[in-house]
Swiss-Prot record:
Catalyzed reaction equations: an N-acetyl-alpha-D-glucosaminyl-diphospho-di-trans,poly-cis-dolichol + UDP-N-acetyl-alpha-D-glucosamine = an N,N'-diacetylchitobiosyl-diphospho-di-trans,poly-cis-dolichol + UDP + H(+)
Family: Belongs to the glycosyltransferase 28 family.
Location in or out of the cell: Endoplasmic reticulum
Name by which UniProt lists this protein: UDP-N-acetylglucosamine transferase subunit ALG13
EC number: 2.4.1.141
Organism name: Saccharomyces cerevisiae (strain ATCC 204508 / S288c)
Transmembrane segments: none
Length: 202
């Protein structure tokens, strides 16, 4: 498979609770090889609060090397928490930070594909910006609302969904490169909002 264009994947774990399984899977050799095969050259990871040292350790475990090149911190809205690395013998740049005040800008301007935890706000951010989205459910959380929400969006044809495993994420990535999702209705949609509320509280 030839590389047609240089693409970026944005992974968001949410603002509060870290999602170590998701971060570990997207940094695995198998997943990164698949990314490169599909023409991705940049992996941007928003990993959540109080996870910086674990993230750095994980990247270094996978052979990542710190890069001194200046990151567009102003555009990313992440203060001085951002770190940049190279993986896979320099074929993949990895940018990681804990939190951003400009998530929608990152999704709109720096992402060709988004992998998100199953928080409703994060899902809607990507869909409203017309970005293809893979939803990864955090199965370590106490309730199953995330699973219900993800299932409903999948049923409606707006997203792909996967478990936080290498196999699941690779399957989601492959689907995103070969299938098309239904366009999300960006205008105010009371019936959809009611459906979402019913799903969350059912």
């Amino acid at each position: 498979m030839g590389i047609i264009e240089e693409k970026a994947l944005f992974v968001t774990c949410g603002a509060t609770v870290p999602f170590p399984k998701l971060v570990s899977c997207v940094l695995s050799d198998e997943f990164c090889q698949e990314l490169i095969q599909y023409g991705f050259v940049r992996l941007i990871i928003q990993f959540g609060r109080n996870y910086s040292s674990e993230f750095e350790h994980l990247v270094q475990e996978r052979g990542g090397q710190r890069e001194s090149q200046k990151i567009p911190i102003d555009q990313f809205g992440c203060g001085d928490t951002a770190r940049q690395y190279v993986l896979m013998n320099g074929k993949l740049k990895v940018i990681g930070f804990d939190f951003s005040t400009k998530m929608q800008s990152i999704i709109r301007d720096y992402s060709d594909l988004v992998i998100s935890h199953a928080g409703t706000g994060s899902i809607l951010d990507s869909l409203r910006l017309n970005k293809p989205l893979i939803v990864c459910v955090n199965d370590s959380l106490m309730d199953n609302h995330q699973q219900q929400i993800a299932d409903k969006f999948v049923e409606l044809g707006y997203v792909w969904s996967c478990a936080p495993t290498e196999t699941g994420l690779i399957a989601g990535l492959r689907a995103s490169q070969t299938e098309k999702l239904k366009p999300f209705p960006v205008s105010h949609n009371p019936s959809f909002e009611r459906l979402l509320v019913e799903t969350i509280y059912s």
